[in-house]
């Protein structure tokens, strides 16, 4: 088994606390609403949203995968940090055992925020992750962020 790391940063004009609340804490309901072409639904299979919770993310018809299951590893409200692992489903395929993800949202002096994202791809056997594949996954995540950001800009009273 190999572990391949991919780290990235992206900026947002949304303040860190508001973005954490909307994108992370309430994302299970907000993201399917603002990006139904990407995610149909999110449901808790077990747990209450905290560490140990298992979530099932269902993708719309026509997507390359039907669903994935994720386990919440950490929710740090004080430091706007969220960690989770993708543990089952089509996105893992025959080559990945799991993907561990960490998102930390940091406030910027201008009132916006920086999302610091770390992904660890745990492969099966001697399979290697290609940089372009990891970059494509990052771009899909960034598209979800932009959908949430657009919603928040259009609804200034939401998720405050």
Curated annotation (Swiss-Prot):
- Determine the domain of life of the protein's source: Eukaryota
Q: Which family does it belong to?
A: Belongs to the BetVI family.
Q: What is this protein called?
A: Major pollen allergen Bet v 1-K
Its source organism is Betula pendula (European white birch)
Q: Name one GO molecular function term.
A: abscisic acid binding
What InterPro entries does the annotation carry? Bet_v_I/MLP, Bet_v_I_allergen, Plant_def-hormone_signal, START-like_dom_sf
Gene3D superfamilies the record matches: 3.30.530.20
Give residues annotated as binding brassinolide: 55, 82, 84, 101
Gene Ontology cellular component annotations, sorted alphabetically: cytoplasm; nucleus
Compartment(s) of residence: Cytoplasm
Q: What is the annotated role of this protein in its UniProt record?
A: May be a general steroid carrier protein.
Example GO biological process: defense response
Pfam families, alphabetized: Bet_v_1 (PF00407)
PROSITE patterns assigned to the protein according to its UniProt record, in alphabetical order: PATHOGENESIS_BETVI (PS00451)
Signal peptide feature range: none
Its keywords, alphabetically, are:
Allergen, Cytoplasm, Pathogenesis-related protein, Plant defense
């Amino acid at each position: 088994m190999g572990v391949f790391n991919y780290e990235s940063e992206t900026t947002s004009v949304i303040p860190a606390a508001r973005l954490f609340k909307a994108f992370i804490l309430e994302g299970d309901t907000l993201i399917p609403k603002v990006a139904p072409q990407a995610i149909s639904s999110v449901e808790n299979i077990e747990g209450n949203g905290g560490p140990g919770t298992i979530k099932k993310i269902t993708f719309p018809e026509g997507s390359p995968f039907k669903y994935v299951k994720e386990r919440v590893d950490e929710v740090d409200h004080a430091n706007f940090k969220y960690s989770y692992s993708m543990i089952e489903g089509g996105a893992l395929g025959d080559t990945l055992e799991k993907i561990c993800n960490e998102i930390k949202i940091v406030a910027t002096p201008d009132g916006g925020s920086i999302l610091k994202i770390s992904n660890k791809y745990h492969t099966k056997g001697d399979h290697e992750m290609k940089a372009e594949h990891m970059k494509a996954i990052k771009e899909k995540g960034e598209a979800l962020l932009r959908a949430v950001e657009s919603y928040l800009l259009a609804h200034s009273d939401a998720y405050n």
